[in-house]
């Protein structure tokens, strides 16, 4: 960049301002990255807990399913699963975490609306259906938490790349420009000082010679 910049005092001031801006930007990005890292590790705990919860409710649901098949027959369970199948509604909103857009999913409270008569269905089959409803809730929670985790992780990487670009490329480049401009300005100042000294020396030498000439002329007149 030094070869593309004009080595003037105004350019030096502009480069100093750019350096201050870049350094401030790097500091802000590092603070954002640190905050995101803290949020990331908190979400890791939530994600692990959600996964553990999913494993627990899944195990319980399959235990209920096996019991239902044993007591109420596989045909009855399959018939109930077809009768009770349908859409699973969730409420999703977008929230911002340090500028990162992430989904916030709310699971509405389940209501016991069924397409079958409980009189004709065994208690274990109904329990299995209820337990698998809990599995769906756990899956949604895992998906929401891991989506947040992934997006924040991506933002951490992006922010780190921006910090590295500023600290390793932009800021050193501006510092090189400042050193180059200062070097040229210092050289010009030295040259100007040297030129002034030479001019001053010539003027003094000329004045001295003129004084000598005047003195010589005065001596000649006195002798006449």
Curated annotation (Swiss-Prot):
Transferase keyword on record: no
Region (Disordered): 205-224
InterPro entries linked to this entry: V_ATPase_D
Keyword terms: ATP synthesis, Hydrogen ion transport, Ion transport, Transport
Biased composition (Basic and acidic residues): 205-214
Source taxon at top rank: Bacteria
Keyword Transport on entry: yes
GO molecular-function terms, A-Z: ATP binding; proton-transporting ATP synthase activity, rotational mechanism; proton-transporting ATPase activity, rotational mechanism
Residue stretches of biased makeup (Polar residues): 215-224
Disulfide bonds: none
Classification via Pfam families: ATP-synt_D
Annotated GO biological process: proton motive force-driven plasma membrane ATP synthesis
Stated family: Belongs to the V-ATPase D subunit family.
Record's function text: Produces ATP from ADP in the presence of a proton gradient across the membrane.
HAMAP family in the cross-refs: ATP_synth_D_arch (MF_00271)
Protein name as annotated: V-type ATP synthase subunit D
Organism: Deinococcus deserti (strain DSM 17065 / CIP 109153 / LMG 22923 / VCD115)
């Amino acid at each position: 960049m030094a070869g593309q910049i004009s080595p003037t005092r105004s350019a030096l001031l502009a480069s100093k301002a750019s350096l201050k801006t870049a350094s401030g930007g790097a500091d802000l990005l590092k603070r954002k990255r640190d905050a995101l890292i803290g949020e990331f590790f908190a979400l890791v705990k939530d994600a692990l807990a959600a996964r553990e919860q999913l494993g627990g409710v899944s195990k319980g649901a399959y235990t209920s399913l096996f019991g239902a098949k044993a007591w109420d027959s596989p045909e009855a369970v399959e018939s109930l699963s077809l009768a009770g199948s349908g859409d699973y509604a969730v409420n999703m909103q977008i929230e911002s975490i340090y500028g990162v857009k992430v989904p916030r999913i709310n699971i509405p409270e389940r209501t016991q609306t069924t397409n079958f008569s409980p009189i004709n269905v065994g208690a274990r089959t109904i329990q299995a259906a209820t337990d698998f409803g809990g599995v769906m809730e756990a899956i949604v929670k895992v998906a929401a938490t891991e989506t947040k985790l992934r997006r924040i992780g991506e933002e951490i990487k992006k922010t780190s790349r921006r910090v590295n670009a500023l600290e390793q490329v932009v800021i050193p480049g501006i510092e090189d420009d400042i050193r180059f401009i200062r070097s040229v300005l210092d050289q010009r100042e030295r040259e100007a000082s040297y030129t002034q000294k030479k001019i001053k020396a010539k003027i003094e030498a000329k004045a001295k010679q003129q004084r000598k000439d005047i003195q010589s002329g005065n001596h000649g007149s006195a002798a006449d």
